């Protein structure tokens, strides 16, 4: 199995790359052929053969996160060489082995052709922490936004933007669509409430049967260890 993994690390976030690379190689899909796609404004020398570097200027907040779909698309041709695309935040680390069997497992007898996308249940939503499960939750309520969500009934899952992806054709379709939605919002001077994460949640909710949801134990901060 060939897997492309996206690392966006501009400015000081590039400092996370050495540990990120080491942990990905050691713990994440250990029997797969992995390529790390590093988007950065920093200088990298003597990089491993499976680390591909793409120049990316640092953008002010929140655009460095909001425009991540556009950033990732710079590596489109490299992504196409793989079976799976995975996004993992620069400051997120696998700390225990995630096997191929675990990663590819799907509920209720389904397979990855039927459920080609994946996300992770936000641990703060799981723990019912504010603003989740209160009022309008963490959803965009501006009807003019591409990420607008009818909050009359809040969904049972809110996905965190730190860990998501899918089989390459489905993942690229998602990246293209969300890049277009972000651009249309920006043309109207709209930034969704939680930026790229808000856009991801709208997209996943529209396709909930195409999305496998990993539990919050795949995304929690160390301080949540006793809860997840």
Predicted stretch roles:
Residues 1-67, 74-81:
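N-terminal anchoring/stem segment of glycosyltransferases
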Residues 10-12, 42-45, 58-59, 92-94, ...:
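Short, solvent-exposed loop/turn segments at secondary-structure junctions
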Residues 15, 45-47, 94-97, 102-103, ...:
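Short catalytic/ligand-binding loop motif for oxyanion handling, primarily in non-cytosolic enzymes
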Residues 15, 19, 71, 79, ...:
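Catalytic phosphate/metal-binding cores of nucleic-acid and nucleotide-processing enzymes, i.e., regions
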Residues 37-38, 86-89, 94, 165, ...:
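A structural signal for short, well-ordered beta-strand segments and their strand-loop junctions
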Residues 56-88, 95-96, 195-205:
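A conserved donor-nucleotide-binding helix/loop in the catalytic core
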Residues 93-143:
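Conserved donor-nucleotide/metal-binding helix-loop-beta segment in metal-dependent transferases, i.e.
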Residues 145-228:
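Catalytic core and acceptor-binding pocket of nucleotide-sugar-dependent glycosyltransferases
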């Amino acid at each position: 199995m060939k897997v492309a993994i996206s690392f966006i690390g501009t400015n000081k976030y590039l400092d996370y790359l050495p540990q990120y690379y080491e942990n990905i190689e050691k713990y994440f899909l250990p029997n797969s052929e992995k390529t790390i796609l590093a988007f950065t404004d920093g200088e990298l020398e003597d990089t491993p053969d499976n680390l591909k570097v793409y120049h990316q200027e640092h953008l002010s907040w929140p655009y460095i996160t909001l425009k991540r779909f556009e950033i990732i698309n710079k590596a489109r041709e490299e992504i196409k060489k793989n079976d799976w695309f995975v996004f993992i935040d620069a400051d997120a680390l696998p700390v225990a082995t995630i096997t191929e069997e675990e990663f590819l497992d799907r509920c209720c007898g389904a397979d990855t052709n039927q459920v080609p996308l994946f996300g992770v249940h936000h641990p703060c939503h799981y723990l019912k922490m504010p603003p989740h499960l209160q009022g309008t939750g963490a959803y965009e309520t501006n009807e003019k936004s591409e990420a607008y969500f009818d909050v009359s009934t809040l969904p049972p899952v809110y996905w965190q933007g730190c860990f998501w992806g899918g089989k390459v054709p489905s993942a690229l379709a998602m990246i293209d669509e969300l890049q277009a939605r972000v651009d249309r919002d920006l043309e109207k001077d709209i930034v969704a409430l939680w930026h790229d994460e808000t856009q991801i949640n709208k997209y996943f909710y529209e396709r909930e049967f195409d999305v496998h949801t990993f539990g919050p134990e795949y995304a929690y901060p160390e301080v949540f260890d006793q809860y997840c």
